[in-house]
Amino acid sequence: MPIITSYFGFLLTALTIASALFIGLSKIRLI
């Protein structure tokens, strides 16, 4: 169970970073 939790946390962190990068690129492209 701890392995699944840590994997889910890692996935959530990666998704958050990816979305933040995507939003940043979109803002730069809009300007």
Swiss-Prot record:
Note the subunit structure. Answer: The 4 large subunits of the cytochrome b6-f complex are cytochrome b6, subunit IV (17 kDa polypeptide, PetD), cytochrome f and the Rieske protein, while the 4 small subunits are PetG, PetL, PetM and PetN. The complex functions as a dimer.
Protein name, per record: Cytochrome b6-f complex subunit 6
- Give one GO biological process term: photosynthesis
Q: What does this protein do?
A: Component of the cytochrome b6-f complex, which mediates electron transfer between photosystem II (PSII) and photosystem I (PSI), cyclic electron flow around PSI, and state transitions. PetL is important for photoautotrophic growth as well as for electron transfer efficiency and stability of the cytochrome b6-f complex.
One GO term in the molecular function aspect is: electron transporter, transferring electrons within cytochrome b6/f complex of photosystem II activity
Q: Which GO terms describe its cellular component?
A: chloroplast thylakoid membrane; cytochrome b6f complex
Topology of the protein relative to the lipid bilayer: Single-pass membrane protein
Signal peptide limits = none
Organism, scientific name: Helianthus annuus
Phylogenetic placement of the source organism = Eukaryota, Viridiplantae, Streptophyta, Embryophyta, Tracheophyta
At the top level of its lineage, which domain of life is listed? Eukaryota
Q: What is its main location?
A: plastid
Tell me its family: Belongs to the PetL family.
Q: Which residues cross the membrane?
A: 3-23
The family database entries (PANTHER family) matched by this protein are listed as: CYTOCHROME B6-F COMPLEX SUBUNIT 6
Q: Could you tell me where this protein is found in the cell?
A: Plastid, Chloroplast thylakoid membrane
Q: Name one Pfam family in it.
A: PetL
Q: Which InterPro entries match?
A: Cyt_b6/f_cplx_su6
Q: Which UniProt keywords apply?
A: Chloroplast, Electron transport, Membrane, Photosynthesis, Plastid, Thylakoid, Transmembrane, Transmembrane helix, Transport
